């Protein structure tokens, strides 16, 4: 019984120490005007954004955050349309990926086409990325023109506006907190990613 108690005390102390390391204004910001109705964990990104590429493909922060989330907590990712000549079309394409449930297939291919090979220059090129990912052109076209995708595009636009988004990558928790990307432990990539995920899970417990 004593060992069980000591173990519980250790867990509580460990959580307290971790929580004490996270400070409003350093690792996160509390929004002046919280937005209700937003996803519990919401990330904004753009396929045009070099930092988003590093965030996703090199550091793999979204993957780490998703893995660390408590059971039943969902992470949502929205594309922004204010970057690049095809920003609006890529936001529509991301809505298609969301509707078809192929976000993980599309993400690396689209980043590669937009930033590395620069082969995504037209709406047709965007469509070809989906075909490369195994989605038929017909399915892509049908989804692109669907009510579901139009609604998802509107959701992405409204969330960015309501949260007064100014740049990407950006992650919000419960429509109330924004993670400060520059407030994490930068002593190593692993430490940065772990602390980022820890801050998100910590904020999920805050009222």
UniProtKB/Swiss-Prot annotation:
Q: What are the disulfide bonds?
A: 49-52
Q: Give the domain of life.
A: Bacteria
Give the location in the cell.
Periplasm
What GO molecular function annotation could you give as one example from this UniProt entry? Answer: protein disulfide isomerase activity
- Family from the record: Belongs to the thioredoxin family. DsbA subfamily.
Q: What does this protein do?
A: Required for disulfide bond formation in some periplasmic proteins such as PhoA or OmpA. Acts by transferring its disulfide bond to other proteins and is reduced in the process. DsbA is reoxidized by DsbB. It is required for pilus biogenesis.
In Swiss-Prot or TrEMBL terms, this protein is called Thiol:disulfide interchange protein DsbA
Q: Which organism is it from?
A: Yersinia pestis
């Amino acid at each position: 019984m004593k060992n069980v108690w000591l173990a519980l005390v250790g867990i509580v102390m460990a959580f307290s120490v971790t929580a004490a390391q996270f400070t409003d204004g350093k690792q996160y910001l509390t929004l002046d005007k919280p937005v209700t109705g937003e996803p519990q964990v919401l990330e904004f990104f753009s396929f045009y954004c070099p930092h988003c590429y590093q965030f996703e493909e090199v550091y793999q922060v979204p993957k780490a955050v998703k893995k660390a989330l408590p059971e039943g907590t969902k992470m949502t990712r929205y594309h922004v349309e204010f970057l690049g000549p095809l920003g609006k079309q890529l936001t529509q394409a991301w809505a298609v990926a969301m509707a078809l449930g192929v976000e993980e297939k599309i993400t690396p291919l689209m980043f590669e086409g937009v930033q590395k090979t620069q082969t995504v220059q037209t709406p047709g090129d965007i469509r070809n990325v989906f075909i490369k990912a195994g989605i038929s052109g017909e399915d892509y076209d049908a989804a692109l023109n669907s009510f579901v995708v139009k609604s998802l595009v509107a959701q992405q636009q409204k969330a960015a506006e309501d949260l007064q988004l100014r740049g990407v990558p950006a992650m919000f928790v419960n429509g109330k907190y924004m993670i400060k990307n520059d407030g994490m432990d930068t002593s190593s990539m692993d430490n940065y990613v772990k602390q980022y995920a820890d801050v998100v899970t910590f904020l999920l417990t805050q009222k």
